[in-house]
Amino acid sequence: MSRSPIPSWCFAVAVVKLGRRFLVIRERKHGELWYLPAGRVELAESFAEAAVRETLEEAGLRIELEGILRIEHSPLPGEARFRVIFLARPADDTPPKSRPDEHSLEARWVTVEDLSTLRLRGREMTRLFEDVLAGAPVFPLSLLRPEGEPLLGRAS
């Protein structure tokens, strides 16, 4: 039986936490709604690299990834979608960007309670933030590895 390739879309999402606050960005697209730093994984880029890049582009912040909150696979008719949602912290004290550019309109730190005052892209952020604050499991970054990499890090 012949098999055709399945178009697959890969996305990286960053949940960036500072104390009890989280980083959100106001998107230029999607009706200027608030969401998390996120975007497509580019050719020859890892999910982790994409999360770091998207956060820098959309929020103006350098981050350090702490772990993985979720790995999602959504099979759809004719295609598939993969998303990796990372937990991260800011790498330094740089404030989020406040001027619009081609990537986003602005970024800010918010609490879960602040979300009710913003036009959100969906309820996902509220659930994620509440879960993180409640102690949701954070999986090691090593869970997501390049194909063929040894599990114990030994040379082949």
Feature-to-residue mapping (PLM):
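Conserved N-terminal beta-strand and adjoining loop/helix that marks the start
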Residues: 1-22, 40, 71
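Short secondary-structure boundary/capping segments
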Residues: 6, 14-15, 26, 76, ...
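Residue-level preference for beta-strand/loop junctions
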Residues: 8, 32, 80-82
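Short connector loops/turns at beta-strand edges and beta->alpha or beta->beta junctions
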Residues: 21, 28-31
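A short gly/proline-enriched turn/hairpin at secondary-structure junctions
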Residues: 35-38
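Conserved S-adenosyl-L-methionine
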Residues: 66-70
